[in-house]
């Protein structure tokens, strides 16, 4: 199983004081060295954390691959075609939200998403759609030609009871298997921590997890190398469990 380390909140800390540190590039390189299989960055329309220059700098520095999260806008499409990341993950975006609140509604935007997917695919960029574990959305993702989906794990991570968490887990597990049966590559992420990652990592249909906020928070106490190492180890151990 692959680990994508999201470095958005390295930029959040930097921007809080308007300094040049901590460096997203340095964070990306440290994460790679200690187990990250790819680097994920979300260039939001309001540029609240990652800036345009960060994306270019990280793309040019890393040895693994860049997964660029972006909204379904012409501006972001143009940016992606300039940066040429290995992967683009199209996500829903609202300016007022603190973080991404739900999955992309592919059903409501099939024509536009299909168009973006073709343009990016023709440019050699693999397209992923960040969606809820809903069979209708998964089918729509397949229909528009996206080869990859990322299942939104936020409801699982934010569940206030074990029963609710198990309900959300089963939804993700069923969605992952449904998507895999369609031939889609299945990733997952949002709200995952060292404490809740094990059940999700046990779902064999899921190929990759993208984890950011909790990992950067752990890095404040453990250091980024150890935070990445512990997360990768937790994922690895989960795959060994019966």
Curated annotation (Swiss-Prot):
One MF term in the entry's GO annotations: pyridoxine 5'-phosphate synthase activity
Residues noted as binding 1-deoxy-D-xylulose 5-phosphate in the record, renumbered to the chain: 8-9, 44, 49, 99
One GO cellular component, as annotated: cytosol
Enzyme category, top tier: transferase
Pathway where it operates: Cofactor biosynthesis; pyridoxine 5'-phosphate biosynthesis; pyridoxine 5'-phosphate from D-erythrose 4-phosphate: step 5/5
Gene3D superfamilies named among the record's database cross-references: Aldolase class I (3.20.20.70)
Reactions catalysed, as given in the entry: 3-amino-2-oxopropyl phosphate + 1-deoxy-D-xylulose 5-phosphate = pyridoxine 5'-phosphate + phosphate + 2 H2O + H(+)
Residues at the site labelled Transition state stabilizer: 150
Gene Ontology biological process: pyridoxine biosynthetic process
Protein's cellular compartments: Cytoplasm
Chief location of this protein within or outside the cell: cytoplasm
UniProt keyword terms in alphabetical order: Cytoplasm, Pyridoxine biosynthesis, Transferase
The protein's Enzyme Commission number: 2.6.99.2
Active-site residues per Swiss-Prot or TrEMBL entry: 42, 69, 190
Protein residues bound to 3-amino-2-oxopropyl phosphate: 6, 17, 191, 212-213
Similarity comment text for this entry: Belongs to the PNP synthase family.
Function: Catalyzes the complicated ring closure reaction between the two acyclic compounds 1-deoxy-D-xylulose-5-phosphate (DXP) and 3-amino-2-oxopropyl phosphate (1-amino-acetone-3-phosphate or AAP) to form pyridoxine 5'-phosphate (PNP) and inorganic phosphate.
HAMAP family, sorted: PdxJ (MF_00279)
Oligomer status and interactors: Homooctamer; tetramer of dimers.
Listed name of the protein: Pyridoxine 5'-phosphate synthase
Organism: Neisseria meningitidis serogroup C (strain 053442)
